[in-house]
A protein has these predicted regions:
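Polar/acidic, low-complexity leader/linker segments enriched in S/T/G and N/D
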Residues: 1-47
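Acidic Ser/Thr/Pro-rich low-complexity disordered segments
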Residues: 29-35, 117-127, 170-189, 247-252
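Short amphipathic beta-strand/extended segments with alternating polar/hydrophobic composition
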Residues: 37-40, 126-137, 181, 239-240
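Oligomerization/assembly interface segments of phage tail-like spikes and tubes
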Residues: 48-88, 152-167
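Structured, beta-strand-rich domain cores
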Residues: 64-136, 140
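Mixed-charge, glycine-accented linear interaction segment located at domain edges/termini
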Residues: 139-210, 263-284
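Tryptophan-rich substrate-binding surfaces of secreted polymer-degrading and adhesive proteins
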Residues: 211-263, 284
Length: 284
């Protein structure tokens, strides 16, 4: 007998594994937004721990009349061999002087991104990946165990239990975390939906962009193209405001300054920005 459903088909046996490419974006009180991203080296694990959403039953007319669930909360724990210096303020530590820090201070909130690997039975771990972005994260105090060096090769690690405050997005309930599955469109023969460009934008936004060419008076540019312009020590990154179809000398009217230096710093995009760059996903 033939069934309409095909169980365990080749190429459709998926799994998710690993944790890598952790980045934190500490809150900048001056700018009132998330600041420049910093790579979290030594990240060994991220555990998601949602809570809430419990069901409550309501009774009437001697029967269960309806049920209702409470709002969910999103928590996570971060585990690592060590942490970046920029995380210290998020962990309630302030710097008094070089090498001198004081604890039990106000804990700064941050955004956090990490990447997991999505695999299948035919391509293994090379199938794809999922990028996770958490907003409004705060880390709770955590214990740290220091013990004598002995004949074991084990090293101490750190674990932070974190809670989140959700952000709003029109048409949906407030949320603290979004997931972008890069493997969703990997089988498309052509990039008609612009997904490849959207992924490139996402990665360059989350991790920053450094390989930016200098402005050339003999080149033309599309809207959004980036260039480096300025004398030695005065370089800055600029974005084309509109398409520049005629080559010519530099005109400041055509360009918007993005950042000082020769690279665009890593930053965390808002949910609206992600949705705007992934129209097929947003239309869902």
């Amino acid at each position: 007998m033939a069934y309409a459903l095909n169980f365990d088909a080749e190429g459709e046996r998926f799994y998710e594994v690993g944790t890598k490419h952790g980045v934190i974006y500490p809150w900048d009180t001056t700018q009132q937004g998330y600041g420049q991203g910093v790579a979290w080296n030594g990240l060994t694990g991220v555990t998601e721990s949602p809570s809430g959403g419990d069901e409550t039953s309501f009774w009437a007319d001697d029967m269960k009349y309806f049920t209702r669930r409470g709002n969910e909360e999103f928590g996570l724990s971060i585990k690592a061999f060590y942490y970046p210096d920029e995380f210290a303020e998020c962990d309630g530590t302030a710097k008094l002087a070089k090498g001198v820090r004081i604890r039990q201070q106000t804990r700064k909130r941050f955004a956090f991104t990490w990447e997991t690997t999505r695999g299948n039975d035919t391509e293994g771990d090379a199938y794809g990946s999922v990028i996770h972005i958490a907003y409004g994260v705060t880390a709770s105090p955590s214990s740290k165990d220091n013990s004598t060096i002995n004949d074991s090769a084990d090293v101490s690690d750190f674990t932070w239990e974190c809670s989140t405050t959700p952000v709003t997005y029109p048409g949906y309930k407030p949320t603290s975390v979004i997931d972008i599955d890069i493997s969703d469109y990997k089988d498309a023969e052509t990039d008609t939906d612009g997904f490849d460009a959207a992924v490139e934008w996402l990665l360059e936004t989350l991790y920053g962009k450094s390989d930016i060419a200098e402005f050339s008076a003999t080149a033309t540019y599309a809207k959004g193209d980036l260039v480096v312009h300025g004398g030695s020590g005065m370089e800055a990154v600029y974005e084309a405001k509109a398409a520049i179809s005629t080559a010519g000398a530099w005109s400041s009217d055509d360009w918007l300054k993005i950042a000082d230096g020769t690279a665009v710093p890593a930053r965390v995009p808002s949910i609206s920005e992600v949705a705007d760059h992934f129209p097929a996903v947003a239309a869902g």
